[in-house]
């Protein structure tokens, strides 16, 4: 799916497009969504009555996931929890599918906590980003997260597992189930795929032990859409900027008013562009690409053309995109800056209490 079609579908499925032609197209997709929802409900029931089996790892498992396709900030939340656990002295292993990597489907160690053993194009964006930015964090990839966890037990001896994007991975038993919900559109338009953005019906939210409401505005309250389940409020903030390759990080504020090309291949590139504008950057050109995009020669050439043709002083992208550009040897490489995304949890007590209660058992 190209970026413009993906953007249109996301607007349609999230309920932000409501014209008559849009509603007509949506109505054609609804029967498929009803069938998809029925299949997902049946699958959940089969796991609940144990006709489909979940397997348990010998160490506690903390799952971080969501109900919708696209970005709700899973990787920043996973990174935040990983850093907290490491600071508490635990040996932490992240279990990731390795989506988008050339070795997707293989079970392998991405990082042993000291050495990153793969490139981003092999293991995927998120495992490489976590491995390369969090010292001491172990990362194992595999479509079967139980097998990945057992490999980690054999080779790395972790104290606790973090299951990245694991809400629907019911084959693995988890001890703490954390659900992320976008503040503005927690359930999209309410439909499952393909008429909506839901991976499961909204009733699946009841499996959560803790809800983290992401992308909350700085000052507006974020009431929980799931009363009775403990919840936290989180927002994302762009922190320091890091030059691609060599160079020291510097504050985003130093780019205020500067002419920049913004590009990103993430779930919500336009949200990233808007955050750059809020920081005071002058976006003279934008280049939105599909999530998990591969930066081949054609993509690199397009970035170079946009950079020079727009008169931009710099090109700014996300740190997640940047991990796929580290080996870039091009004239424009010295002008590419990586924006670091930081997670701020305003009320962390429900999260830290849940983590401590689990690990002190």
Swiss-Prot record:
This enzyme's EC code(s): 2.7.1.130
GO CC terms of this entry: plasma membrane
Catalytic activity: a lipid A disaccharide + ATP = a lipid IVA + ADP + H(+)
InterPro entries assigned: LpxK (IPR003758), P-loop_NTPase (IPR027417)
One Pfam family of this chain: LpxK
Pathway annotation from the record: Glycolipid biosynthesis; lipid IV(A) biosynthesis; lipid IV(A) from (3R)-3-hydroxytetradecanoyl-[acyl-carrier-protein] and UDP-N-acetyl-alpha-D-glucosamine: step 6/6
Keyword Phosphoprotein: no
Top-level division of the source organism's lineage: Bacteria
Residues reported to bind ATP: 68-75
GO molecular-function terms, A-Z: ATP binding; tetraacyldisaccharide 4'-kinase activity
Any GO BP: lipid A biosynthetic process
Keyword set, alphabetical order: ATP-binding, Kinase, Lipid A biosynthesis, Lipid biosynthesis, Lipid metabolism, Nucleotide-binding, Transferase
Protein's job: Transfers the gamma-phosphate of ATP to the 4'-position of a tetraacyldisaccharide 1-phosphate intermediate (termed DS-1-P) to form tetraacyldisaccharide 1,4'-bis-phosphate (lipid IVA).
Alphabetical list of HAMAP family matching this protein: LpxK
Family: Belongs to the LpxK family.
Name under which the protein is recorded: Tetraacyldisaccharide 4'-kinase
Annotated source species: Pelobacter propionicus (strain DSM 2379 / NBRC 103807 / OttBd1)
Gene name of the record: lpxK
């Amino acid at each position: 799916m190209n970026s413009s079609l993906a953007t249109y579908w996301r607007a349609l499925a999230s309920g932000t497009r409501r014209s008559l032609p849009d509603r007509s197209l949506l109505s054609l997709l609804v029967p498929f969504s009803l069938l998809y929802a029925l299949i997902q409900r049946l699958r959940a029931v089969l796991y609940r009555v144990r006709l489909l089996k979940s397997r348990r790892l010998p160490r506690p498992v903390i799952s971080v996931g969501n109900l919708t396709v696209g970005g709700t900030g899973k990787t920043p939340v996973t990174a935040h929890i990983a850093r907290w656990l490491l600071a508490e002295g635990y040996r932490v292993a992240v279990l990731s599918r390795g989506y988008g990597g050339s070795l997707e489907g293989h079970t392998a160690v991405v990082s042993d906590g000291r050495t990153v053993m793969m490139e981003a194009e092999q293991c995927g964006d998120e495992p490489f980003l976590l491995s390369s930015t969090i010292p001491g964090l172990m990362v194992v990839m595999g479509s079967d997260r139980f097998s990945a966890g057992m490999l980690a037990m054999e080779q790395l001896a972790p104290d606790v597992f973090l299951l990245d994007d694991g809400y629907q991975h019911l084959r693995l038993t988890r001890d703490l189930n954390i659900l992320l919900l976008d503040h503005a559109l927690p359930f999209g338009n309410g439909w499952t795929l393909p008429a909506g953005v839901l991976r499961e019906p909204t009733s699946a939210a009841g499996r959560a032990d803790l809800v983290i409401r992401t992308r909350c505005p700085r000052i507006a309250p974020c009431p929980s859409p799931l009363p009775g389940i403990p919840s936290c409020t989180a927002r994302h903030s762009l922190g320091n900027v890091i030059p691609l390759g060599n160079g020291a990080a510097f504050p985003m504020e130093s780019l205020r008013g500067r002419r920049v090309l913004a590009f990103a291949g993430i779930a919500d590139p336009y949200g990233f562009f808007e955050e750059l504008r809020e920081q005071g950057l002058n976006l003279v050109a934008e280049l939105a690409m599909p999530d998990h995009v591969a930066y081949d020669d054609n993509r690199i050439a397009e970035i170079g053309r946009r950079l020079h043709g727009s008169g931009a002083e710099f090109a700014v992208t996300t740190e997640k995109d940047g991990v796929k550009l580290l080996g870039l040897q091009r004239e424009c490489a010295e002008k590419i800056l990586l924006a670091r995304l930081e997670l701020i949890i305003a009320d962390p007590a429900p999260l830290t209490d849940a983590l401590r209660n689990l690990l002190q058992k």
